[in-house]
Every structure is written in C-alpha cells, then in structure tokens.
Amino acid sequence: MGRPLIRIAGGLLLGILVAAGGLAGAEELKVGYSAITANQVPLWITKEAGFFEKNRLEVTLVFIEGGSKTTQALLAGDVPIVQVGGSSVVQSRLAGSEAVIIAGAFNTLNFKLVTVPEITEPRQLKGKIVGTSRFGSSNDFAARFMLEHFGLAPDKDVPIIQIGSEPARFAALKGGSIHATLVEVPTTLQARKLGFNIIADLGELGLEYQHTAIATTQGVIQTRPEAVRRFMKAYVEGIHYYKTRKAESMAVIAKYLKMNDMEAVEEAYNEIGVKRTPRKPYPTLKGVQLILSEIADVNPKARGTKPETFVDARFVKELDDSGAIDRLYR
C-alpha cells in the first residue's frame, strides 16, 4: 500500500474511532448545504472525519441546490443549520426572516483573472475586452472590482461583455473575441494547461465578501444553543483537519466533487483549504456590507441596515476566547 493510501486509511480510521467515542447520547441534526463546490469542503470534511460524532451530534448532510432554496429550508425548520451563500441569508433577513450568519466559511470571492498569452500584466488590459458570465453576477462584480483596483475604469477603459459559462468564456478566449475573464479554482488549472496567463488573484487583493457562511435562525439559537455550540466546535476541528491532513482531505474533495483529476483536486486543496479557509471562521462584517451595497439598487432596505444585523458570532468567539482554536494548531 502506498503512502497516500496509508494516510487516507489512517484518516478514515481516525474518523471511525472518533465516531465510536461520541455516538452515545448524540443529538440528531440535519445540516443543509447549497452547492457542490470547493467552498463547501469544510462541512464535508467535518462529517467524514467524525468530528460531529465526537461532539455528540448525529449529523445528516442534506444537499439543497441553490442558496434561496437552502435558506427557505432553513426557515421552514427542515434543516436547523446550513452552509450557504451569505447573500441568500442577507436577502432573506431583509425580507423579514430571522436567519442569521454564525460563521464565515469563505470570506472572499474565489476568482482569478485569466488572460490571453500576450497579456502578462493588468495595465495591458486597457482597450481590451473582458468577458463575464452575466451582468450583475458575482463574476461580473469581481471583474469590475479587479479593474478598478488596477486603476482601470470598467466599460470606459476596458469594455465588459456577457459571455456565459466558464466553457463559453474559455472558447471566447481561444477564439480571440475576449482577452480576459475570471474563473474559479480549480478551473484555473485548466486555464494554465490551455496556455492562458493568470495575472491576478482576487483573494490576494484584500477583498472581503461573505461568499459562503454557516447560518441558522434566532429561534434555533434560543431553543438549541448547545447543539449549535457543539456544531461550531466540530466545525473548527474539521477546519484544522482540513488544513493539516492533506491526503485525507483531498480524498474527501475528490469524493464530493466527483473529480478523478488529482492535480485539480490538489489545486482546490492548496488554493482554498490552505490559503483561504479561515482557522477562526468569524463572519466578515465588511463582506456583509459589500453584499448590502451590491443589492442596494434593487432593494432599498439594504441602504439603511447595518451589517451587524445579519451576524451572530458568539459561538466562534466563545471558542476563540477559550483558546480552543489556538490549541488545535500547537
């Protein structure tokens, strides 16, 4: 048996042992998640490695496609906790719900700027065409943010057009109808293999955005505080496992994303697990404010609402203040 398989088997054994020690008296808890993307990995790893059972929770993960449907299931009581896009929670709360963000799973946008081979730095984009998925999307927002960061005026210095999906944008790059676009990890690996350049990483430009969050309701916090507390303890333990057990974590990524290309799996692990997943998963108030600013034109309620309205970080703060998170990394 090769070393990677030994490490993976060891990790699975750890999960079994952890689970065996924690099942007695475990509380049942359904947890929803809204997408099959690399940003969702911490939840899957926490489940697969047995940390919910260690913390006396018998968790069933439920995939509910799309942020709005997942948030609706949360509000209906079908799933008391969800991992979902932050914007879905914000819009739901603005509409009068009691949904609240209790942790930040991914606090920026997972986009990199990909260009045709002859463009090697952002200033060369002046007068060129950038393709986005659709106007008003997070992809479009990220493209405009990047251009402004590099001193280029979107639409004026750099025309922006709608193209559609990532495959469509790659085809447009290859065909020369656009000169740049934004793609997510691990599609960045494919971009490099096709000979395109990656000249900027949004996550390294300091942008805070509540891309993916752990959310519940105020009612659940009031009626099941210990379940939420144990969930959060398991979750930060899962993040630690994610960051420190590469082979086992890659196996979970490959399983849930149904990926056979281990080079792409490693790209996702390094770029998201190691670089972008926070050890201390506090929600980002700046990131929530950015969501509010983004939707203010279509929802005037967003203008006068403070980001603190949407966040309750007490459970992460308890763990942080107790030193429990820091001890994991010693």
Language-model-detected regions and their locations in the chain:
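Short, glycine-/small- and polar/acidic-enriched structural segments
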Residues: 27-175, 179-185, 198-208
